[in-house]
Amino acid sequence: MKSLLATLALTTALTLPGLALAKPVTLSTTLNAYGGEGAYLAYYVTDASGAYVGSLWMAGGKSKYYEHLGDWYRATGGDTAQVNGITGASVGSGRKLDVTLDLADALFDAGYTLHIDAAVEDMRDSPNEIAVPLTTDGAGKAVQGRRYIASFQYDM
Amino acid sequence: MIRAFHRWPGLLALALVTLLALSGAALSVFPAAEQLAAPQASADLSVATLAGRVQAAYPGVEQIRRAPSGRVTAYWFDQGTPGAAVIDPATGQGVASADPGQVQRWLTGLHRSLFLGDGGRLAMAAGAAAMLVLSLSGVALVARRTGGLRHWFTRLRGPLAGRLHVEIARIAVAGLLLSSVTALWMAASTFGLLPETGGAPAFPAAVSGQTGIAPAQIVTLTQTPVSTLRELSFPYPGDATDAFTLKTDRGTGYLDQGTGALLAWADLTAGQRMSETIYMLHTGQGAALLGLMLGLMALGVPVMAGTGVALWLSARRGRPRIRDNQPASQAETILLVGSEAGSTWGFAATLHEALTRAGQTVHVGPMSDFAPETYGRARRILLFAATYGDGAAPASAAGFLDRLERATPLPEIPMAVLGFGDRSFPAYCAFANAVTSAACAKGWEALLPPDTVDRQSPQDFARWGRALGQRLGLPLELSHQPVAPRTQTLTLLSRRDYGAEVQAPTAILRFALPRQSLWQRLTGAGFARFSAGDLIGILPDDGAAPRLYSLASGRRDGFVEIVVRKHPGGLVSSRLTALHPGETITAFLRPNPGFRPGRGKAPLILIGAGTGIGPLAGFLRANRRRPVHLFFGMRHPDSDFLYHSEIADWQAQGRLTRLVTAVSRGVKPHYVQDALHAEAAQVTQLIREGARVMVCGGRDMAAGVTEALAEILAPSGLTPAMLKAGGRYVEDVY
């Protein structure tokens, strides 16, 4: 189980009291059958003002393609240290990705938003494919992405 | 050594390299097709105008991209649904689907990774590396074969597979080098092995906060021609902190969505430019014509793979297994072989077997292993030396001369050199001669005078074997058949006799074409495909080496014809000249591609004496348009004027331009070389016009002809050797 704590500790943006309190959260993403190469997906969190807080997961291992995850790339400057240790394979057309992470309790119901940027080779980039507020109530509720993601939900 | 660097990557990566080349060739078509199909922007169209048109057609436009082919694609969002289309820049309207075709995607996946992810990518990168090694080692081999890079496009001789392999390679290698180097660069970049090339500029810390400027009003965009555009991204609707992102072939920048001001700009780094150039060179995207050329060159790879394997197999077949080979330290006779294609090993195996049967201990090895200090019990060293190209050491003799130079001569171990070569090449047995001179200069005692074997002649080899046997005090009868020939039965149709009155009984024998199986017809094996000048071999009853006769007919003539002179005591010639129509012999076919008139319309000068007229008559019978001058030497026109009546017919039909005869029996003996001298002016003129000289007959006659031509051509600055080097002077000598 990957720990967000270590990752977020790298960024100075999130230094909340009570961070030690964390619980496992599963991020479930199902892709449309868009019929292309594997999709790169960047999962990251912004705060209430829209500022980048930290990354949760990167689906896709080749950093030379990260610039196509436009918002994430802009927020991080393409810094691969942001996704060190939390990077997995890209997700094929029509496939499902489940990632379980220890997320700090403090991230919920505090104005934070979870974003997913998506990109597929030779197809349109889709930054901000998903943007859902992290709330206790929102858990388990599926949302649809703009182009590649058929459904996304987080479960606690 | 270099050959090993060519052979093993070639064999191991055969399938991979072929797959890469074929899929690459197929992919090379797409950039050109895209360029032809995509509506192109007019030269003066600005990005501002284009963006305005697209936004009018698709108000939810998010991004406009321009591919190197000139194809403009727009992506938009309309009531929660994303859309995309190829745009006609003149109208801003979509004209075609923006999704890449399934075929292209499938081919790309195959070409890049065999659909196997990173493992497949590594495999394909290994294939590209193999291609690079093959290209480089191939260049070295071709340079060695042709005598240097300066002679890159020199004429080639030899069997078809080898010629085809090199002919394709010397054109395709440029493309294959480019494709494999760029492929490896791209693979290294994919696996993050190259330094980061830098990216977009940092997003500006502050924007105006205003929104709503029309793209057509943005000054930067009005100054940016569409031809330089890579990508224009529109700000998110409702996000006042966002901005336009513009990427061009110069760099990347951000434009304020309220004021249109250029907020930040970063030029492309040198690394990025390099990456883009390499991508273009590999994919042909942005260089469609280059892509097509690379694809065409890649198509040569499957042919080279096939011919390469054929070459390898034939070299393997030509190198027999040697039984009871003794270690070098134990053997009395050290037999070292310098062979390129492997045929000389067969001779070594024959000698090894004969000597072993005679009770000798023999070691056979490559000349490159020469190490006289290890030959503890050796009494003699025998060297079988073929020649590569213009006198270079053949593959298995690499480094021999250096080793010989360093070695201390052992006076008690004499040395014998037997050269293997082809007299029709100017550098006949040049390497063997170099070995002989080097050994002589170092003071090695010669066991036998140096000798040569012309075109794998079993007779030459047997003669040398007898000389060796005599020297060793052993009866040594060497019967070597380079390739076990597959014989067929030929039935005599007719015979015409000449020359009895001048003590040269000669017969023109015409045999029926043997029946060919379907397989033989398909593969051109045996008598299914032959032309005048090829050889047929006839095995004597006593199992000695076969006798070879030049064919005076081609497959199209519908018969097999040879000219045979009866030699006193000659077993085969006696049997042949005693044949009656209806009787049969068994014979095999041996192609002789070095002795053909070739294509083209340049004049031919055919020179022959006695039975040497045979193949020349075959050339005349098949001639359509070429001017042909025949110099024919005979003893007496009333007795051995072979093909007399046909020659008259051929002259009447225009197949023969001019006949010059030389008669040797008479008051004043006259030979073909005399006839050449008499016609010196015309001969010189013809050769200046590019004429090809073909000589067939006895060895003395051929030497006389060469001498005469040397004298005739001297004033014009040409020599027979120059003509030979240019493939314009060929001999078939016996």
Language model segments and positions:
Chain A
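Bacterial N-terminal signal peptides that target proteins for export
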Residues: 1-8
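N-terminal signal peptide c-region/cleavage motif recognized by signal peptidases
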Residues: 15-17
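Short amphipathic, basic-aromatic surface patches that mediate peripheral association
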Residues: 24-35
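Extended, low-complexity, turn-rich repeat/linker tracts enriched in Gly/Pro/Ser/Thr and Asp/Glu
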Residues: 33-36, 122-124
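Short coil-to-beta strand junction motifs in C2/discoidin
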Residues: 37-41
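Beta-strand signatures of extracellular beta-sandwich domains
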Residues: 42-46, 115-117
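Structured domain cores in non-transmembrane regions
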Residues: 48-111
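Glycine-rich, aromatic-bearing surface loops/beta-hairpins
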Residues: 103, 109-156
